[in-house]
Amino acid sequence: MKMKKIILLFLSAILVFSFCGCDIISDLMDMGIQEPDGPANIPDVPEVLEPVDPNWPVTAFGAEIPAKPEKVAVASPALAEYISDMGYFEKVCAVPEFCGFDEAAVKPKIGSVRLPDLEAIKSAEPEYILTFAKFEESVLIELQQMNITVICMDAPMSLDELRTLYKEIALFFSGAVDGITEGENYVAEYDSALSALAYSGEKKTAGFIRALDYMMITGGTFENEILSAAGIINVAENYSGYVFPEENWKEFDPDVIFLNPDIHLIDLETSDLYKKKTAVKNDRVYNVDIDAIGIGSKRSLDIIKDVLATVYGDYSGGTAYSPAYPSMYQK
Protein backbone atom coordinates (compact mmCIF):
# COMPACT_ATOMS: atom_id res chain seq x y z
CA MET A 1 0.00 0.00 0.00
CA LYS A 2 2.78 2.33 0.90
CA MET A 3 4.54 1.50 -2.36
CA LYS A 4 1.43 2.37 -4.38
CA LYS A 5 1.30 5.84 -2.77
CA ILE A 6 4.91 6.44 -3.72
CA ILE A 7 4.25 5.42 -7.32
CA LEU A 8 1.16 7.65 -7.52
CA LEU A 9 3.12 10.64 -6.20
CA PHE A 10 5.88 10.00 -8.73
CA LEU A 11 3.44 9.83 -11.64
CA SER A 12 1.71 13.00 -10.46
CA ALA A 13 5.05 14.83 -10.41
CA ILE A 14 5.78 13.75 -13.97
CA LEU A 15 2.41 15.00 -15.17
CA VAL A 16 2.86 18.36 -13.43
CA PHE A 17 6.30 18.79 -14.99
CA SER A 18 5.00 17.83 -18.42
CA PHE A 19 2.32 20.51 -18.34
CA CYS A 20 4.39 23.25 -16.70
CA GLY A 21 7.72 22.48 -18.31
CA CYS A 22 6.55 23.47 -21.81
CA ASP A 23 5.44 26.84 -20.49
CA ILE A 24 8.77 27.38 -18.74
CA ILE A 25 10.75 26.53 -21.89
CA SER A 26 8.48 28.76 -23.96
CA ASP A 27 9.05 31.63 -21.52
CA LEU A 28 12.79 31.10 -21.68
CA MET A 29 12.74 31.16 -25.49
CA ASP A 30 10.72 34.36 -25.43
CA MET A 31 13.55 35.84 -23.36
CA GLY A 32 16.06 34.83 -26.03
CA ILE A 33 17.31 31.83 -24.09
CA GLN A 34 17.23 28.55 -25.98
CA GLU A 35 16.99 25.05 -24.71
CA PRO A 36 20.36 23.73 -23.66
CA ASP A 37 20.32 21.06 -26.31
CA GLY A 38 19.21 23.44 -29.10
CA PRO A 39 21.46 25.37 -31.56
CA ALA A 40 23.36 28.35 -30.11
CA ASN A 41 21.70 31.70 -30.75
CA ILE A 42 24.85 33.59 -31.94
CA PRO A 43 24.07 36.97 -33.49
CA ASP A 44 25.36 37.60 -37.05
CA VAL A 45 28.72 39.46 -37.15
CA PRO A 46 28.92 41.92 -40.06
CA GLU A 47 31.78 41.19 -42.50
CA VAL A 48 34.62 43.75 -42.26
CA LEU A 49 35.48 44.94 -45.80
CA GLU A 50 38.82 46.43 -46.80
CA PRO A 51 38.50 50.10 -47.82
CA VAL A 52 38.38 50.50 -51.61
CA ASP A 53 40.97 52.88 -53.13
CA PRO A 54 39.21 54.66 -56.01
CA ASN A 55 42.56 55.30 -57.71
CA TRP A 56 43.21 51.67 -58.61
CA PRO A 57 43.05 50.01 -61.00
CA VAL A 58 43.68 52.71 -63.60
CA THR A 59 44.34 52.70 -67.32
CA ALA A 60 47.47 54.63 -68.30
CA PHE A 61 49.38 54.48 -71.59
CA GLY A 62 46.76 51.99 -72.78
CA ALA A 63 47.63 49.47 -70.05
CA GLU A 64 45.77 48.55 -66.87
CA ILE A 65 47.76 49.38 -63.75
CA PRO A 66 46.25 47.33 -60.88
CA ALA A 67 47.99 49.07 -57.97
CA LYS A 68 50.23 52.01 -57.18
CA PRO A 69 53.65 51.46 -58.81
CA GLU A 70 56.53 51.40 -56.33
CA LYS A 71 59.58 50.63 -58.48
CA VAL A 72 59.77 51.89 -62.05
CA ALA A 73 62.70 51.89 -64.48
CA VAL A 74 62.79 54.33 -67.39
CA ALA A 75 64.58 53.54 -70.66
CA SER A 76 64.27 56.91 -72.45
CA PRO A 77 66.16 60.01 -71.19
CA ALA A 78 63.47 62.56 -72.04
CA LEU A 79 60.77 60.46 -70.39
CA ALA A 80 62.86 60.21 -67.22
CA GLU A 81 63.17 64.00 -67.23
CA TYR A 82 59.41 64.52 -67.57
CA ILE A 83 58.80 62.17 -64.63
CA SER A 84 61.39 64.02 -62.55
CA ASP A 85 59.84 67.41 -63.37
CA MET A 86 56.46 66.17 -62.16
CA GLY A 87 57.78 65.02 -58.79
CA TYR A 88 57.49 61.24 -59.24
CA PHE A 89 61.22 60.53 -59.43
CA GLU A 90 61.33 58.82 -56.02
CA LYS A 91 59.47 55.91 -57.63
CA VAL A 92 62.13 55.60 -60.35
CA CYS A 93 64.66 52.91 -59.45
CA ALA A 94 66.82 53.09 -62.61
CA VAL A 95 67.38 55.36 -65.62
CA PRO A 96 69.06 55.11 -69.03
CA GLU A 97 72.51 56.37 -69.89
CA PHE A 98 72.96 59.92 -71.16
CA CYS A 99 70.28 61.65 -69.11
CA GLY A 100 70.97 65.38 -69.26
CA PHE A 101 69.43 66.47 -65.96
CA ASP A 102 71.14 66.49 -62.57
CA GLU A 103 68.68 64.33 -60.61
CA ALA A 104 69.45 61.33 -62.83
CA ALA A 105 73.10 61.21 -61.76
CA VAL A 106 72.36 59.33 -58.51
CA LYS A 107 70.14 56.67 -60.07
CA PRO A 108 71.42 53.24 -61.25
CA LYS A 109 71.94 53.08 -65.02
CA ILE A 110 70.41 50.38 -67.22
CA GLY A 111 71.98 51.18 -70.58
CA SER A 112 69.67 52.05 -73.46
CA VAL A 113 66.86 50.44 -75.42
CA ARG A 114 69.30 49.32 -78.10
CA LEU A 115 71.95 48.18 -75.62
CA PRO A 116 70.15 47.37 -72.38
CA ASP A 117 72.11 46.24 -69.34
CA LEU A 118 70.00 43.25 -68.32
CA GLU A 119 72.03 42.56 -65.18
CA ALA A 120 71.51 46.13 -64.01
CA ILE A 121 67.80 45.84 -64.75
CA LYS A 122 67.62 42.60 -62.77
CA SER A 123 69.41 44.24 -59.83
CA ALA A 124 67.06 47.23 -59.87
CA GLU A 125 64.02 44.89 -59.65
CA PRO A 126 61.50 47.21 -61.33
CA GLU A 127 57.84 46.33 -61.63
CA TYR A 128 57.62 48.36 -64.84
CA ILE A 129 59.88 49.75 -67.54
CA LEU A 130 58.59 52.85 -69.33
CA THR A 131 60.06 53.67 -72.73
CA PHE A 132 59.57 55.69 -75.92
CA ALA A 133 61.29 53.04 -78.07
CA LYS A 134 60.64 49.32 -78.42
CA PHE A 135 63.02 46.69 -77.13
CA GLU A 136 64.08 43.88 -79.45
CA GLU A 137 61.86 40.81 -79.15
CA SER A 138 64.58 38.71 -77.53
CA VAL A 139 65.18 41.39 -74.87
CA LEU A 140 61.46 41.77 -74.29
CA ILE A 141 61.14 38.04 -73.61
CA GLU A 142 63.94 38.19 -71.03
CA LEU A 143 62.29 41.14 -69.31
CA GLN A 144 58.97 39.30 -69.21
CA GLN A 145 60.73 36.32 -67.62
CA MET A 146 61.83 38.74 -64.87
CA ASN A 147 58.12 39.56 -64.32
CA ILE A 148 58.68 43.12 -65.58
CA THR A 149 55.86 44.86 -67.44
CA VAL A 150 57.21 46.93 -70.33
CA ILE A 151 55.07 49.88 -71.41
CA CYS A 152 56.02 51.62 -74.66
CA MET A 153 54.50 54.94 -75.68
CA ASP A 154 55.04 57.57 -78.38
CA ALA A 155 57.38 60.48 -77.68
CA PRO A 156 55.57 63.85 -77.84
CA MET A 157 55.92 65.69 -81.13
CA SER A 158 53.97 68.81 -80.16
CA LEU A 159 53.00 70.81 -77.10
CA ASP A 160 49.54 69.23 -77.11
CA GLU A 161 51.07 65.75 -77.16
CA LEU A 162 53.38 66.75 -74.32
CA ARG A 163 50.39 67.93 -72.27
CA THR A 164 48.65 64.60 -72.90
CA LEU A 165 51.79 62.72 -71.87
CA TYR A 166 52.03 64.67 -68.60
CA LYS A 167 48.45 63.67 -67.78
CA GLU A 168 49.15 60.00 -68.55
CA ILE A 169 52.25 60.06 -66.34
CA ALA A 170 50.15 61.41 -63.48
CA LEU A 171 47.54 58.66 -63.99
CA PHE A 172 50.25 56.00 -63.98
CA PHE A 173 51.86 57.13 -60.74
CA SER A 174 48.85 58.48 -58.79
CA GLY A 175 45.78 56.68 -60.11
CA ALA A 176 42.36 57.42 -61.55
CA VAL A 177 41.30 60.15 -59.11
CA ASP A 178 44.45 61.77 -57.74
CA GLY A 179 46.18 61.36 -61.09
CA ILE A 180 43.58 63.41 -62.96
CA THR A 181 43.95 66.28 -60.51
CA GLU A 182 47.74 66.15 -60.44
CA GLY A 183 48.01 65.93 -64.23
CA GLU A 184 45.72 68.88 -64.85
CA ASN A 185 47.50 70.95 -62.20
CA TYR A 186 50.90 70.24 -63.70
CA VAL A 187 49.80 71.08 -67.23
CA ALA A 188 48.37 74.38 -65.97
CA GLU A 189 51.67 75.08 -64.19
CA TYR A 190 53.64 74.24 -67.35
CA ASP A 191 51.49 76.44 -69.57
CA SER A 192 51.85 79.29 -67.11
CA ALA A 193 55.64 78.94 -67.14
CA LEU A 194 55.70 78.86 -70.94
CA SER A 195 53.54 81.98 -71.18
CA ALA A 196 55.60 83.82 -68.56
CA LEU A 197 58.88 83.48 -70.44
CA ALA A 198 57.56 84.81 -73.78
CA TYR A 199 59.19 87.97 -75.20
CA SER A 200 56.80 90.56 -76.60
CA GLY A 201 59.19 93.26 -77.83
CA GLU A 202 60.62 93.84 -81.29
CA LYS A 203 61.62 90.49 -82.73
CA LYS A 204 64.92 89.32 -84.21
CA THR A 205 65.67 86.19 -86.19
CA ALA A 206 67.73 83.25 -85.00
CA GLY A 207 69.06 80.07 -86.53
CA PHE A 208 69.59 76.83 -84.59
CA ILE A 209 72.25 74.71 -86.30
CA ARG A 210 72.47 70.98 -85.66
CA ALA A 211 75.23 70.18 -88.14
CA LEU A 212 77.45 72.25 -90.42
CA ASP A 213 75.57 71.69 -93.64
CA TYR A 214 71.89 72.56 -93.88
CA MET A 215 70.64 70.73 -90.79
CA MET A 216 68.82 72.92 -88.29
CA ILE A 217 65.55 73.42 -86.44
CA THR A 218 62.88 74.10 -89.04
CA GLY A 219 59.15 74.68 -89.00
CA GLY A 220 56.80 71.77 -88.37
CA THR A 221 58.88 70.58 -85.41
CA PHE A 222 58.33 70.38 -81.68
CA GLU A 223 61.38 72.60 -81.11
CA ASN A 224 60.05 75.31 -83.40
CA GLU A 225 56.66 75.27 -81.69
CA ILE A 226 58.30 75.89 -78.31
CA LEU A 227 60.60 78.61 -79.69
CA SER A 228 57.68 80.32 -81.40
CA ALA A 229 55.62 80.24 -78.20
CA ALA A 230 58.56 81.94 -76.47
CA GLY A 231 58.65 84.78 -79.00
CA ILE A 232 61.65 83.68 -81.08
CA ILE A 233 61.52 83.98 -84.86
CA ASN A 234 63.22 80.95 -86.37
CA VAL A 235 64.81 81.91 -89.69
CA ALA A 236 64.00 78.41 -90.98
CA GLU A 237 60.38 78.28 -89.79
CA ASN A 238 59.00 78.22 -93.35
CA TYR A 239 60.76 74.95 -94.11
CA SER A 240 60.45 71.45 -92.67
CA GLY A 241 62.27 68.22 -92.00
CA TYR A 242 65.22 69.82 -90.15
CA VAL A 243 66.81 70.80 -93.47
CA PHE A 244 67.10 74.29 -94.96
CA PRO A 245 66.74 74.00 -98.76
CA GLU A 246 70.09 74.42 -100.47
CA GLU A 247 68.52 76.33 -103.35
CA ASN A 248 67.23 78.96 -100.91
CA TRP A 249 70.41 79.29 -98.88
CA LYS A 250 70.72 83.01 -99.64
CA GLU A 251 67.67 83.52 -97.40
CA PHE A 252 69.55 82.15 -94.42
CA ASP A 253 70.96 85.24 -92.70
CA PRO A 254 69.70 85.39 -89.10
CA ASP A 255 70.64 88.05 -86.53
CA VAL A 256 71.90 85.35 -84.15
CA ILE A 257 73.12 81.79 -84.67
CA PHE A 258 73.04 79.03 -82.04
CA LEU A 259 75.16 75.92 -82.48
CA ASN A 260 75.00 72.50 -80.91
CA PRO A 261 77.86 72.17 -78.38
CA ASP A 262 79.79 69.74 -80.58
CA ILE A 263 80.19 72.37 -83.35
CA HIS A 264 83.27 74.60 -83.08
CA LEU A 265 83.01 78.25 -84.02
CA ILE A 266 86.21 78.15 -86.04
CA ASP A 267 84.62 75.54 -88.30
CA LEU A 268 81.64 77.82 -88.85
CA GLU A 269 83.83 80.83 -89.61
CA THR A 270 85.83 78.90 -92.18
CA SER A 271 82.81 77.22 -93.79
CA ASP A 272 81.89 78.50 -97.23
CA LEU A 273 78.24 78.16 -96.24
CA TYR A 274 78.44 80.28 -93.10
CA LYS A 275 81.51 82.50 -93.05
CA LYS A 276 79.85 85.44 -94.82
CA LYS A 277 76.63 85.40 -92.79
CA THR A 278 75.84 88.50 -90.71
CA ALA A 279 75.70 86.72 -87.34
CA VAL A 280 79.13 85.18 -87.94
CA LYS A 281 80.73 88.48 -88.89
CA ASN A 282 79.12 90.25 -85.91
CA ASP A 283 80.32 87.60 -83.44
CA ARG A 284 76.73 86.67 -82.63
CA VAL A 285 77.28 82.93 -82.57
CA TYR A 286 76.69 80.88 -79.41
CA ASN A 287 76.82 77.26 -78.32
CA VAL A 288 73.61 75.94 -76.77
CA ASP A 289 72.17 72.49 -76.12
CA ILE A 290 69.75 72.45 -79.04
CA ASP A 291 68.75 68.84 -78.39
CA ALA A 292 67.62 69.82 -74.87
CA ILE A 293 65.34 72.51 -76.29
CA GLY A 294 63.46 69.78 -78.13
CA ILE A 295 62.62 67.91 -74.92
CA GLY A 296 60.24 70.60 -73.70
CA SER A 297 61.04 70.01 -70.02
CA LYS A 298 61.59 72.57 -67.27
CA ARG A 299 65.28 72.51 -68.18
CA SER A 300 64.31 73.27 -71.78
CA LEU A 301 62.37 76.33 -70.68
CA ASP A 302 65.36 77.52 -68.64
CA ILE A 303 67.58 77.18 -71.73
CA ILE A 304 65.05 79.13 -73.80
CA LYS A 305 65.10 81.92 -71.20
CA ASP A 306 68.85 82.20 -71.71
CA VAL A 307 68.39 82.10 -75.49
CA LEU A 308 65.90 84.97 -75.21
CA ALA A 309 68.31 86.96 -73.03
CA THR A 310 71.02 86.38 -75.66
CA VAL A 311 68.87 87.43 -78.62
CA TYR A 312 67.16 90.36 -76.89
CA GLY A 313 69.32 92.60 -74.74
CA ASP A 314 66.31 93.94 -72.82
CA TYR A 315 65.03 90.51 -71.77
CA SER A 316 65.56 90.04 -68.04
CA GLY A 317 64.19 86.53 -67.54
CA GLY A 318 67.43 84.69 -68.29
CA THR A 319 71.21 85.00 -68.53
CA ALA A 320 72.77 85.82 -71.89
CA TYR A 321 75.33 83.38 -73.27
CA SER A 322 78.87 84.46 -73.99
CA PRO A 323 80.00 84.04 -77.60
CA ALA A 324 81.22 80.54 -78.39
CA TYR A 325 84.74 81.95 -78.12
CA PRO A 326 86.40 85.08 -79.56
CA SER A 327 85.64 85.26 -83.23
CA MET A 328 88.21 85.78 -85.94
CA TYR A 329 86.03 88.77 -86.87
CA GLN A 330 86.11 90.27 -83.40
CA LYS A 331 88.10 93.51 -83.21
Feature-to-residue mapping (PLM):
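Gram-positive cell-envelope targeting signals
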Residues: 1-30, 143
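A short, structured surface patch at a secondary-structure boundary
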Residues: 70-133
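Alpha-helical, coiled-coil/dimerization segments enriched in small aliphatic residues
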Residues: 98-101, 183, 215-242
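Proline-aspartate-enriched helix->loop->beta-strand connector
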Residues: 115-134, 148, 243-262
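Extracytoplasmic ligand-binding site segments that recognize negatively charged/polar headgroups
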Residues: 138, 153-170, 205-224
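Structured C-terminal subdomain patch of bacterial secreted/periplasmic proteins
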Residues: 160-184, 195, 259-331
